């Protein structure tokens, strides 16, 4: 691969990453914070705490707050041609909650905040075969076991976050590379960015679901 081909690939990935983040923002508002994938069912996803939109290096808008994407300034930035480059996301699935920052251009997450809650099965698991120990030894071993359990639980939940994002990205690519992008997504996006517009969520959902149902396995 030549240097120019590598640069071209990087630039395309940056563009796709911004479109993906814009699509997540759009769907999270249209579906009122409840998204779904075939593999994971329904879960909560919305923008929280911060969003950064830009057009080139000079025109940058940074918005912070409980729900920055819902501000008038955020939508006006889109109308001026800016696209989201970074956003804080809140993910809620099953009994778990996670917050993190999604960076569109490298398509990566950072600052993952993931409270670790051990499941009942782990808490009630039978202890290893007892051995005579002093009080300090037993306490140290218990703390070590709890630390290991918390570590593996965090790793498991981190992977679940990644899998949900990967599933959403697959859905996005299916729409982006198919006729549904022009026929359904772009018109809905245009209506969504219009201050006077109102997206027909049911019609959009039906169109996107039809497109996703025809995806090749």
How should each PLM-predicted stretch be described?
Residues 1-217:
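Intrinsically disordered, low-complexity, charge-rich terminal extensions
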């Amino acid at each position: 691969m030549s240097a120019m081909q590598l640069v071209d690939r990087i630039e395309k990935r940056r563009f796709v990453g911004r479109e993906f983040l814009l699509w997540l923002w759009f769907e999270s508002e249209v579906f009122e914070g409840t998204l779904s994938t075939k593999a994971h069912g329904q879960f909560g996803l919305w923008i929280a705490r911060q969003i950064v939109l830009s057009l080139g290096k000079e025109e940058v808008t940074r918005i912070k707050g409980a729900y920055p994407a819902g501000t008038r300034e955020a939508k006006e930035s889109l109308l001026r041609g800016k696209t989201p480059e970074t956003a804080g996301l809140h993910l809620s699935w099953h009994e778990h909650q996670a917050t993190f920052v999604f960076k569109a251009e490298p398509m990566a997450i950072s600052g993952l905040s993931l409270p670790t809650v051990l499941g009942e099965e782990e808490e009630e698991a039978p202890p290893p075969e007892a051995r005579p120990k002093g009080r300090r030894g037993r306490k140290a071993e218990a703390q070590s076991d709890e630390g290991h359990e918390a570590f593996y639980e965090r790793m498991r939940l981190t992977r679940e976050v990644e899998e949900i994002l990967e599933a959403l990205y697959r859905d996005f690519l299916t729409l982006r590379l198919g006729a549904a992008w022009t026929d359904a997504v772009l018109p809905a996006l245009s209506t969504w960015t219009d201050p006077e517009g109102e997206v027909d969520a049911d019609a959009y959902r039906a169109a996107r679901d039809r497109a996703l149902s025809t995806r090749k396995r």
